[in-house]
Amino acid sequence: MVKLIESKEAFQEALAAAGDKLVVVDFSATWCGPCKMIKPFFHSLCDKYSNVVFLEVDVDDCQDVAADCEVKCMPTFQFYKKGQKVGEFSGANKEKLEATITEFA
């Protein structure tokens, strides 16, 4: 299940709760066409990779989280391990998204 992050505190808690698991964060917006396009694929990955934590951040609802994470465009995917960012890319690239998950998971 993809967890919707609604505050800076919830984001920090989710990263901490993940422990050693890979955390994949989808920074998106409701008005973003490419975000809508990749969203079902992103959600399908959480069934395929049960050992990975999937988070979703709406940049309009959580501007502080997006600013802290230096998100400049949507969609941006960030990858965290043990609370530290280990990877990031922007764009609705399904192949790159899954390849990056398999690289870090």
From Swiss-Prot:
Superkingdom in the source lineage: Eukaryota
Functional note: Participates in various redox reactions through the reversible oxidation of its active center dithiol to a disulfide and catalyzes dithiol-disulfide exchange reactions. Plays a role in the reversible S-nitrosylation of cysteine residues in target proteins, and thereby contributes to the response to intracellular nitric oxide. Nitrosylates the active site Cys of CASP3 in response to nitric oxide (NO), and thereby inhibits caspase-3 activity.
Main localization, broad class: nucleus
Protein name (Swiss-Prot/TrEMBL): Thioredoxin
InterPro entries given in the database record: Thioredoxin, Thioredoxin-like_sf, Thioredoxin_CS, Thioredoxin_domain
Residues recorded as bearing N6-succinyllysine in the entry: K8, K94
Record GO biological process: cell redox homeostasis; cellular detoxification of hydrogen peroxide; cellular response to antibiotic; cellular response to glucose stimulus; cellular response to hyperoxia; cellular response to xenobiotic stimulus; negative regulation of protein export from nucleus; negative regulation of transcription by RNA polymerase II
Lineage: Eukaryota, Metazoa, Chordata, Craniata, Vertebrata
Keywords attached to this entry: Acetylation, Activator, Cytoplasm, Disulfide bond, Electron transport, Nucleus, Redox-active center, S-nitrosylation, Secreted, Transcription, Transcription regulation, Transport
PTM entry text: In the fully reduced protein, both Cys-69 and Cys-73 are nitrosylated in response to nitric oxide (NO). When two disulfide bonds are present in the protein, only Cys-73 is nitrosylated. Cys-73 can serve as donor for nitrosylation of target proteins.
Subcellular location: Nucleus; Cytoplasm; Secreted
Cystine bridges: C32-C35
Residues at the site labelled Contributes to redox potential value: G33, P34
Gene name of this polypeptide: Txn
Sites of N6-acetyllysine modification: K3, K39, K94
Oligomer and partners: Homodimer; disulfide-linked. Interacts with TXNIP through the redox-active site. Interacts with MAP3K5 and CASP3. Interacts with APEX1; the interaction stimulates the FOS/JUN AP-1 DNA-binding activity in a redox-dependent manner.
